């Protein structure tokens, strides 16, 4: 209880109802409250005034908050909640947020009719110290509204009177300014100074160039640590200040150099937000000193060229060459490349014999899309290093103000960041608030005062800082870096600055922000402001500043000359990616010995005797085991588990995430078993042997965009891991369309970034309506080109087994899109023999007619893909005049293989492509030209006819009856029935 009292501190007003209720309990029965409270209340009761137990009431200063007070909360929780005001208030002086009455009010005594008001000072020690505690706490909570954050001075700043932060609000006056304050308190810290000195200190700390929001943090230790750090002085030596100035000179100098040499060229200058580059560089140095070995940075286009050079270490000549020649990669690679301000880079930085690896992630213009990719890449690197404390590899994300509060992926990424499967030990966020979103003012882009409200979802500390005060920016950065490393959580530094030019250098901002840009035009740069400060303090003279600029320009002139003959380099396929090829040289043999498969399968079906698994699963596992040992055909789930188990036993780590993927949306996988008694779990795939690799499976939060982005990022770090994301239904994958369009399908040709990510998308038309039928197969086929990925619609367990193993055993890495089954998971014909998974077997992209037929008697050949095959197969029955061929892989289209099969049917009169999807969806529009080409190559003078659903705006009908009619119609039409 003593600790609770300490945390409750000076009995701030939010606890009034809580303390009053305790006091009433004490009056009724002193033994009903803790001993410490008994002693506390005894001090009140022992007063000479007689108390009437039915009417005595304690009045304590309070604050008005939005949430209702929960009187059952512990004092620790109360100390961290936003609390409601008490239901009553005995005295309220003025329209303020807190009562100025600081006394214990003893109501009228029934026996004497007298009343008495006892000064609180008499019962709580020195009154001024008590009031000072309240003042400190109030400054901490609300003084950010008074902070000088806007370098343009456009904001009308509030005053102390506006916020009731003058000393009179706390029952103090000027006569007490020289009175000594002596506070020893766990929450507000230790203070021993004059009241005037306290006020000065609080003003300097909380109403200067830094404003903080820490009250959303529930952990008292974290909050105290942050306030104490902020209240501590940070000093910079003369040499430190010169280094800072030099950094500012280089940031501004490079932007101006490009502006002069390439007028009008887009570069998305950082000018106005120069401090952000210096802060990022400082954060890296600080992180290195704290044991960080690698940092991955994600950011948008603004300030990227300066980040590439000043922060990450890309040669200036390499960036300048991009302006001169336009080439970013060697011509012989024959890739599309991307604009300069989207490209990433990697390098090593060494300071004081300490080395840190830096990576700037490639990104598109889609703002904030890179956030989960960076997080996933960091998690993968941490796993490679065995960095379970998440302290050796970290992420830095740089956001724009309008994007941070406008893009939904920010909230998705923040929400998932504390979850076990996605935790990377916190991210250092810099929000570069230049007070504009292209042409939109802040009032048009958000309803909140700050752009950082999303960060409160995870109770991240937020430090707002004036971008013109470089030393304040560095102090905030220092606190943020230390916090992330100490507590392993996200932290946000918002740098309020401005944008010197328009959205790009060719844009005219005066059309829409005339007032702002009139101020900006006459405003000294951050570098000039800081140089003037150093001149005034006698650290440098004007010649020193001029010389710094001249020397840096001379350096850039040399880099410019070298850039004229610079040949771009391709930084990829190094490190863990050595041995991986861009071009697939041969088909991998993916089969596994039959005995090995049976042994692995048996092991997968073993459940510990003391593990209380659901009885239905016991039967399921027994049936699987019997299937394997008796050499019966296996189903899809068993084949998938065998693929995983064989890879794990060969040393390949596997990571599978997605909504409900542990069990499987359709209750087929059951790779995580749950104890029915104590909720513990057992994962058979992690209990194969002592030498096996790791199987990580996690049910994700309800997100597609951020989760798929995270897994894509994870796949970039290590090609030797099998990384999978499974959609709950394929229909929901388009919630992550940006990841598919901007990253998965195009990252290799834009940025030379390869990925072996596997995407499982349940897809089939089964009468479940327009939202549970289609993974939009057509969209993936539209994205497919230049051997950028595999798009498959497999129909057999053998196919999924080989596809999964091929992702690792191939000598290249391409994303694999799988239209995965739903009803086929339990279809009696959707099975494979173990021999089809056995030694010297491989994935077959095309499956010929399964029955033995006389090709001379075949009058019709139907090509199809996916579940519709089984519908056709069952309806065809014993008709031996129709051959059905399956395409298990749609892209890349195996032209030669298909042509060789069709040659067998050169006497066939009719060729049909059959699909379940509407004509404007599915594979038809992609595949029709390919199919007719292979007919010609096979020497067959014919064309493929379409059979399927008619064109439709919606993927499927909502009625099961209507679905069944459509399905029967297309099947009969295809079969000629």
From Swiss-Prot:
It catalyses: N(6)-[(R)-lipoyl]-L-lysyl-[protein] + 2-oxoglutarate + H(+) = N(6)-[(R)-S(8)-succinyldihydrolipoyl]-L-lysyl-[protein] + CO2. InterPro entries: 2-oxogl_dehyd_N (IPR032106), 2oxoglutarate_DH_E1 (IPR011603), DH_E1 (IPR001017), KGD_C_sf (IPR042179), ODO-1/KGD_C (IPR031717), RPE1 (IPR005728), THDP-binding (IPR029061), Transketolase-like_Pyr-bd (IPR005475). Its cofactor is thiamine diphosphate. The keyword Oxidoreductase applies. GO terms for biological process: glycolytic process; tricarboxylic acid cycle. GO terms for molecular function: oxoglutarate dehydrogenase (succinyl-transferring) activity; thiamine pyrophosphate binding. SMART domains: Transket_pyr. Residues 77-125 form the RPE1 insert domain. Homodimer. Part of the 2-oxoglutarate dehydrogenase (OGDH) complex composed of E1 (2-oxoglutarate dehydrogenase), E2 (dihydrolipoamide succinyltransferase) and E3 (dihydrolipoamide dehydrogenase); the complex contains multiple copies of the three enzymatic components (E1, E2 and E3). Belongs to the alpha-ketoglutarate dehydrogenase family. This is 2-oxoglutarate dehydrogenase E1 component. It comes from Rickettsia felis (strain ATCC VR-1525 / URRWXCal2). The gene is sucA.
């Amino acid at each position: 209880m003593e600790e609770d009292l300490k945390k409750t501190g000076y009995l701030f007003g939010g606890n009034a109802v809580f303390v009053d209720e305790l006091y009433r309990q004490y009056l009724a029965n002193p033994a009903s409250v803790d001993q410490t409270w008994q002693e506390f209340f005894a001090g009140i009761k022992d007063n000479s005034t007689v108390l009437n137990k039915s009417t005595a009431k304690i009045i304590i200063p309070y604050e008005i908050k939005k949430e209702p007070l929960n009187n059952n909360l512990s004092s620790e929780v109360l100390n961290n909640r936003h609390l409601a005001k008490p239901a009553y208030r005995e005295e309220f002086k003025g329209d303020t947020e807190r009562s100025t009455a600081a006394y214990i009010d003893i109501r009228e005594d029934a026996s004497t009719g007298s009343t008495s008001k006892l000064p609180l000072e008499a019962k709580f020690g020195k009154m001024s110290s008590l009031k000072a505690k309240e003042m400190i706490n109030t400054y901490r909570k609300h003084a950010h509204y008074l902070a000088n954050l806007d370098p343009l001075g456009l904001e009308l700043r509030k005053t102390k009177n506006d916020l009731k932060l003058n000393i009179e609000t706390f029952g103090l006056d000027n006569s007490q300014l020289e009175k000594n304050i002596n506070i020893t308190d766990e929450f507000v810290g230790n203070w021993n100074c004059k009241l005037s000195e306290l006020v000065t200190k609080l003003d300097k700390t909380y109403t200067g160039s830094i404003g903080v929001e820490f009250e959303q943090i529930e952990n008292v230790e974290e909050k105290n640590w942050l306030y104490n750090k902020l209240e501590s002085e940070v000093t910079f030596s003369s040499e430190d200040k010169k280094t800072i100035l030099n950094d500012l000179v280089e940031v501004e100098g490079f932007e101006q150099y490009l502006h002069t040499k390439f007028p009008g060229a887009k570069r998305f200058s950082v000018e106005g937000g120069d401090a952000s580059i210096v802060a990022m560089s400082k954060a890296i140095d600080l992180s290195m000193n704290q044991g960080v070995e690698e940092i991955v940075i994600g950011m948008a286009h603004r300030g990227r060229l300066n980040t590439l050079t000043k922060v990450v270490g890309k040669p200036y000549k390499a960036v300048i060459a991009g302006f001169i020649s336009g080439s970013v990669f060697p011509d012989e690679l024959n890739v599309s490349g991307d604009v300069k301000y989207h490209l990433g880079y990697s390098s090593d930085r060494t300071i004081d014999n300490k080395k840190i690896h830096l990576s700037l992630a490639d990104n598109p213009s889609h703002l904030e899309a890179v956030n989960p990719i960076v997080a996933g890449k960091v998690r993968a690197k941490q796993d490679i290093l065995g960095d379970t404390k998440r302290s050796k590899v970290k992420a830095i994300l740089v956001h724009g103000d309008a994007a941070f509060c406008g893009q939904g992926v920010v909230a998705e990424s923040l929400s998932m960041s504390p979850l076990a499967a996605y935790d990377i030990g916190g991210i250092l966020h810099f929000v570069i608030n230049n007070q504009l979103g292209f042409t939109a003012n802040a009032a048009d882009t958000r309803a909140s005062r700050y752009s950082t409200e999303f960060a409160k979802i995870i109770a991240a500390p937020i430090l707002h800082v004036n971008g013109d005060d470089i030393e304040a920016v560095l102090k905030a950065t220092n606190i943020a870096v230390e916090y992330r490393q100490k507590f392993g959580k996200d932290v946000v530094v918002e740098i309020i600055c401005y944008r010197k030019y328009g959205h790009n250098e060719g844009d005219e901002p005066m059309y829409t922000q005339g007032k702002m840009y009139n101020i900006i035009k006459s405003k000294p740069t951050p570098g000039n402001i800081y140089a003037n400060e150093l001149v005034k303090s006698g650290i440098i003279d004007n010649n020193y500043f001029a010389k710094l600029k001249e020397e840096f320009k001379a350096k850039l002139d040399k880099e410019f000359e070298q850039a004229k003959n610079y040949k771009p380099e391709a930084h990829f396929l190094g490190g863990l990616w050595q041995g991986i090829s861009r071009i697939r040289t041969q088909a991998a043999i993916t089969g596994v010995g039959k005995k090995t498969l049976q042994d692995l399968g048996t092991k997968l079906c073993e459940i510990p005797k003391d593990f209380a698994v659901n009885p239905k699963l016991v039967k399921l596992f027994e049936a699987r085991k019997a299937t394997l040992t008796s050499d019966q055909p296996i189903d899809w789930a068993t084949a998938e588990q065998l693929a995983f188990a064989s890879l794990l036993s060969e040393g390949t780590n596997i990571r599978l995430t997605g909504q409900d993927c542990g069990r499987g949306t359709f209750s087929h996988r059951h790779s995580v078993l749950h104890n029915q008694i104590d909720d513990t779990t057992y994962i058979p795939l992690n209990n194969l042997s002592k030498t096996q690799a790791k199987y990580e499976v996690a049910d994700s939060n309800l997100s597609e965009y951020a989760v798929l982005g995270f897994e894509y990022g994870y796949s970039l770090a290590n090609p030797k891991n099998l990384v999978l994301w499974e959609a709950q239904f394929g229909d929901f994958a388009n919630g992550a369309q940006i990841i598919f369009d901007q990253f998965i399908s195009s990252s290799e040709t834009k940025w030379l970034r390869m990925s072996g990510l596997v995407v499982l998308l349940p897809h089939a038309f089964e009468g479940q309506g327009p939202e549970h039928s289609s993974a939009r197969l057509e969209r993936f086929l539209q994205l497919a080109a230049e051997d950028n990925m595999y798009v498959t619609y497999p129909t057999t367990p053998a196919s999924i087994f080989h596809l999964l193993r091929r992702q690792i055993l191939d000598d290249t890495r391409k994303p694999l899109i799988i239209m995965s089954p739903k009803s086929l998971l339990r279809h009696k014909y959707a099975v494979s023999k173990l021999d089809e998974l056995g030694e010297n077997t491989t994935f077959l992209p095309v499956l010929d007619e399964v029955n033995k037929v006389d090709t001379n008697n075949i009058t019709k050949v139907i090509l199809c893909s996916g579940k519709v095959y089984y519908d056709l197969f069952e309806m065809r029955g014993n008709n031996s005049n129709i051959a059905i061929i399956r395409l298990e892989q749609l892209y890349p289209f195996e032209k030669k293989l298909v042509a060789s099969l069709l040659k067998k049917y050169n006497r066939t009169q009719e060729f049909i492509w059959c699909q379940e999807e509407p004509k404007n969806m599915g594979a038809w529009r992609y595949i029709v030209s390919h199919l007719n080409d292979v007919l010609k190559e096979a020497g067959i003078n014919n064309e493929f006819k379409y059979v399927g659903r008619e064109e439709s705006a919606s993927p499927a009908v909502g009625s099961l009856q209507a679905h069944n009619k459509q399905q029967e119609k297309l099947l009969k039409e295809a079969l000629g029935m």
